[in-house]
Curated annotation (Swiss-Prot):
Protein name (database record): Peroxiredoxin
SUPFAM superfamilies associated with the record: Thioredoxin-like
Protein's organism: Chlorobaculum tepidum (strain ATCC 49652 / DSM 12025 / NBRC 103806 / TLS) (Chlorobium tepidum)
Catalytic reactions on record: a hydroperoxide + [thioredoxin]-dithiol = an alcohol + [thioredoxin]-disulfide + H2O
Primary site of residence: cytoplasm
Subunit-structure text: Homodecamer. Pentamer of dimers that assemble into a ring structure.
PROSITE patterns on file: THIOREDOXIN_2 (PS51352)
A Pfam family this chain is assigned to: 1-cysPrx_C
Disulphides: C199-C205
Length: 211
């Protein structure tokens, strides 16, 4: 199972958009690979619609979506057709037809529940590194806005060398400010409060993102 900071495992897969190499075909782009237990199930259907409703928001931040389950491609295709015909939502992102080997490699098989994959989420960066891993039980649908927020804050943290507070940009303590990494020596700690940051103490300083 890939851990944070690992290279995402090289996978050659079949999808509803044709063959794909993951993460090779995604290099240079952020991506969210999310698994679902099975096609033609209610919670999964609501999740796919919710992801599709946010495709443009993910694209705007340079992030691609890829679905996955242990179902065959023809099942994925038929399910996508059903969603279009009955819910008037056109699923535009690819869906991987995984097998047990791939699912086990990613740690996505639910113990005691056969070949149904758990609701896993992997966020990969443009270098193919695993940056975030989430697992949800079969009974609970995911919060797509939180996944979108997580990708955004990872990008901001990388670009600005800052840490992001809880619930950013709506943190109750520091609102939309970002956190300055704590000083790592005594001299820097002394200087920290002299710099133009808002500080509760030398180890807890924050600032506006654009400052």
């Amino acid at each position: 199972m890939p851990l944070l900071g690992d290279d995402f495992p090289e996978l050659k897969v079949q999808t509803t958009h044709g063959p794909m190499n993951i993460p090779g075909d995604l290099k240079g782009s952020w991506f969210v690979l999310f698994s679902h237990p099975a096609d033609f199930t209610p919670v999964c259907t609501t999740e796919f619609v919710a992801f599709q409703q946010r495709v443009e928001a993910f694209e705007k931040i340079g992030c691609k979506l890829i679905g996955m389950s242990v179902d065959q491609v023809f099942s994925h295709i038929k399910w996508v057709e059903w969603i279009k015909e009955n819910l008037d939502v056109d699923i535009t992102f690819p869906i991987v037809a995984a097998n047990d080997r791939i699912a086990n490699k990613l740690g996505m098989l639910h113990p005691g529940k056969g070949t149904n994959t758990v609701r896993a989420v992997f966020v990969g960066d443009p270098n193919g590194k695993v940056r975030l891993v989430l697992y949800y039980p079969q009974e609970i649908g995911r919060n797509m806005d939180e996944i979108l927020r997580a990708v955004k804050v990872l990008q901001i943290s990388d670009s600005n060398k800052v840490a992001m507070p809880a619930d950013w940009p709506n943190n109750l303590l520091i609102k939309d400010h970002v956190i300055i990494p704590p000083a790592n020596n005594v001299e820097d700690a002394k200087k920290r409060k002299e710099q133009q940051y808002d500080c509760y103490d030398w180890w807890f300083c924050h600032k506006p993102l654009d400052k």
